[in-house]
């Protein structure tokens, strides 16, 4: 029903599933993603938070925080789901810091240095071996924070690159850019993701944008796909940073020096958005719930612009619009100079 854009019928079907199986977590979770897709965020997060029964799922002997006062208390915020999900919801950690006596963030290893180098007012760890359950009054999934806090509003940027890292990449890019607009690119996500076929673009199709003049194309694509960039022609206008992107702290150092990031729905897009960097996100006809429907702006990331497929599976028209917008941006930059 959703793919046929029959939203009223879809809502009725979701509610029917919840009524038939009120204890079925998947039914409540699905209703939550439906409301989030429609932009009904507060309602959506409340239902989305029912995706797991944390008392049963969390393996440490710490009470799960359900909301409410944290005054004088210590709380463990733990990671859940993918890198993009965590980058999205780390925006709410500062609010918890203001509420609690002590905060510890348990995060995936590739994100840890990014947080530590920001010198945050909380502890960062990457393993349960670093934790003692007796130290904490409460625990809460980072991805549950939107459902527990009184407002979804948060300050952006909330992530940034360490100054030393930023300066290292400034020097590297300065040698290559020669006055060109510096644009970072990501065209493919994790191939193991259930929606990857829908969200990723083949490099052969994506590289058509490289015909736009006045741009230094900076490769932020990691994994198997990065080899395609290395094999591309016109080396004078291509800068391959991917081989040095060992973690998100390194990627943040590159992004901090770019004029724009163009990406499909991946963790890099979340990182750029969280840093307040101008980001153009390329979305399939049926996007993930957080990008909502039809709008070109983004509630979560003010500096992000959404380019959506208008025909299912057709990226060519999207890339044409992006190329046109890029040409305008280059011309505007040249006029200013």
Question: Over which residues does each language-model region extend?
Answer:
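Alpha-helical solenoid repeat scaffolds of the TPR/TPR-like class and their adjacent stem/linker regions
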Residues: 1-260, 265-337
